[in-house]
Structures are given as C-alpha cells and as structure tokens.
Amino acid sequence: MRIEAIATGKNPPEDVNVIIEVPIGGEPIKYEMDKEAGTLFVDRFLHTSMRYPGNYGFVPHTLSGDGDPIDVLVCNTRALVPGCVINVRPIGVLVMEDNAGQDEKVIAVPSPKLTLRYENVTEYTHLPEITRQQVQHFFEHYKDLEPGKWVKIEGWHDSKYAKKMIVDAIERAKKGK
C-alpha cells in the first residue's frame, strides 16, 4: 500500500479517509500499519477476550500528540477488510489516558454516500446510548490483562473538538515532513 498516495479526505476535517487496521468484531488481535513499509503487522494479541466495537484505523497524513496518526473508531455494522480505506464523518472524540500518556480516539460514521444509516448522526450523542457504552467499556478494559498497562477514560467531546483535533494533526504532520 502506498500511504502517501491516499488523501487525508475529500474535505477535511468535515470528512476524512480512514485506513482500517482492525475490523469490527474481528478476532482479538491488534494490527498496526507500518507507515514506512505500507504493510499491516500484528502489533499484539489482546489479553482480554474483547472484540473491537467498530472498525478501527487511522487518518493518513496526520500526527497526533502521541506521535502516531490520529486513531479513529468507525461506528458501523459491517466488518471492513484490514487495509481498506473508508470515507467518514467525525462525530466526536473519546479522550483517555493510558500508561503511555493521553490517548484520543476520534469516533466517526461512514459518509452518507456509502450508507444512509448514519446520515442524521452528526454528534456522538446521536448514537444509541448502548453503542456509546460499548465503545467506552471496550477502551476502558481492552488492556486489563496486559502487565503494566492501564486505561482511564477522561470523557467525551463533540464533533467540533474532533474536527479541531484533525486540523491540528494535519498541520503537525505537515511540519514534521
């Protein structure tokens, strides 16, 4: 995969492209894209028997505060193939702290061009309460059995916060080149 050839999105931060690393409901394995090689590697096997509550990946050509591209959880009902690209709309952010520092997960939904299921979902609060609880529970506990690792949820933020985070990450990536 030539990551450099994949656009950040059609109209960032209103919509962005996400390269999927882990599918919804897949085996409890964390895959991570090696940005230099353009190849998916097994990062680790989750010690818990939990499965990702959405398709998980990153926005190309961004750099978050932790030095990696922005993480995104795409809320939808279909498992996507790792390595594929999906166009999404950011609707919020789950802010966490873990053993490595602050960690933020953008929450997004597929663009209306792909499915009408989420066309009226513009904020994370528009998702069903159970979906928000499942996302938070997953990220709060997916590292529970890994020695020396922990996660603390700090809270949720709206789409405006998510879009600002994306703009800042795009600028940070441009400066880093």
Curated annotation (Swiss-Prot):
Essential cofactor(s): Mg(2+)
Assembly information from the UniProt record: Homohexamer.
Keyword annotations from UniProtKB, A to Z: Cytoplasm, Hydrolase, Magnesium, Metal-binding
GO molecular function: inorganic diphosphate phosphatase activity; magnesium ion binding
Binding site for Mg(2+) 1: D66, D71, D103
Similarity annotation: Belongs to the PPase family.
Keyword DNA-binding found: no
The name this protein goes by in its record: Inorganic pyrophosphatase
SUPFAM superfamilies hit by this protein: Inorganic pyrophosphatase
Catalytic activity annotation: diphosphate + H2O = 2 phosphate + H(+)
An annotated GO BP: phosphate-containing compound metabolic process
Compartments, as annotated in UniProt: Cytoplasm
EC assignment: 3.6.1.1
